[in-house]
């Protein structure tokens, strides 16, 4: 008898590719970075938006729970990847996951959760949701890819290109949630002609732009944001955010700001100088003006979607929370000597 015939047989589950021996302990290992970040929740604007849109869509609770889980999973997983790609140090006031678990394990955890979320959607037994999921995950990666390209090549995008990127990256997860809800809403699908159904996408696109530009604004001007993510983190990342793009394009011949971005500085005084420069360029006042315009547009879209049904109050409450004048901090960041404060 040769030595190979004496070898123990392979377990049947290994031969057949069964996952019966996949244990909770192994699952926790893979999801470690994901669970770490998930245990420190953010403000969860996405759940609030789902609840507000559901006042119109009336999605069955069982389907809505699946959608909530999927959106939460994707959001947290995308933050894990964002923090790696941006070399961030803090997220929600705690060390980023890749500084705790390592970069490779964090990337794998996030990618794993993307597919776990897809498996969750299969519960709905609706082919349309898989198409929606794929489409918006493609959009998310397109947006992220352009954002990274501009940063890594020190290329200042046009405002239109930036808004397109935001529509793909930030708007993608917002749209994903609402499109999934529409696919699972009996009342929404009751009309036989799809072109006669309410279109919620323009509203959610506006909210995505509003949310991201407000986030850009707060990153450079908000003390609470500084506590959670660090002082003017966008400058340290070398990111072309909305106010930064305005300041650079307001005076293309002045290379001060673009050189500060190139340095990816951690020097607080340099960052405060950059903020003062943007303030003098009118970039913060311009950003506030754009945000007010987006809020006004969103409120108009709420009334159009509601069409007199009286179900838009939750959405208006959310928009009130996102109003820039509620988030505007005065005189937060000033250089140690000289320079203008935020007006």
UniProtKB/Swiss-Prot annotation:
Name the residues that bind Mg(2+) 1: 82, 86
One GO process term, biological-process aspect = isoprenoid biosynthetic process
**Cofactor binding description:** Binds 3 Mg(2+) ions per subunit.
Q: Enumerate the Pfam families for this protein.
A: polyprenyl_synt
Indicate which residues the UniProt annotation says bind isopentenyl diphosphate: 43, 46, 75, 92
GO MF annotation: an example: (2E,6E)-farnesyl diphosphate synthase activity
Question: Where, by residue number, does the polypeptide cross the bilayer?
Answer: none
Question: Keywords for this entry?
Answer: Magnesium, Metal-binding, Transferase
Its UniProt entry gives the catalysed reaction(s) as:
isopentenyl diphosphate + dimethylallyl diphosphate = (2E)-geranyl diphosphate + diphosphate; isopentenyl diphosphate + (2E)-geranyl diphosphate = (2E,6E)-farnesyl diphosphate + diphosphate; isopentenyl diphosphate + (2E,6E)-farnesyl diphosphate = (2E,6E,10E)-geranylgeranyl diphosphate + diphosphate
Q: Give binding positions for Mg(2+) 2.
A: 82, 86
This chain's protein is named Geranylgeranyl pyrophosphate synthase 1
Instruction: State the organism's lineage.
Output: Eukaryota, Fungi, Dikarya, Ascomycota, Pezizomycotina
Q: What gene is this protein translated from? A: GGS1
